Amino acid sequence: MILCFWLGLFCSISGQAIVHDGDTMRVAGYSVRLAGVDAEELSEPNGYAARDALRAIVRASTVRCEISGKSYNRVVGTCYLGDMDINAEIIRRGYALDCARYSGGKYRTIEPFDARRRLLQKPYCQ
């Protein structure tokens, strides 16, 4: 799969989702960071709530992730459960924020009205 990045090809992986935190899960043996999503870390006030919300969304189901890049030791992508955009859903439910630096603002309009008052955002996403 990593070869497709070097060749500029589209990559997609599918498998059972095992949630790590509110914006990272393991799929088909790869750690996948949800592109454009900023959820609090487990050490932050809403981190466990975000993780539990993502677990409720994916329910250990088979998901498909369209990989768009790499970040540290993870791949980055948009993941789907059927036709549902999981990245959008965790934001829509109010457990994560749009990270405009990486999403281009794609998810900002679906954030709940109070999300930016309740959740911490990483400086690089502002």
Task: Describe each region flagged by the PLM.
Residues 2-126:
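Small beta-barrel nucleic-acid-binding modules, primarily SNase/OB-fold domains
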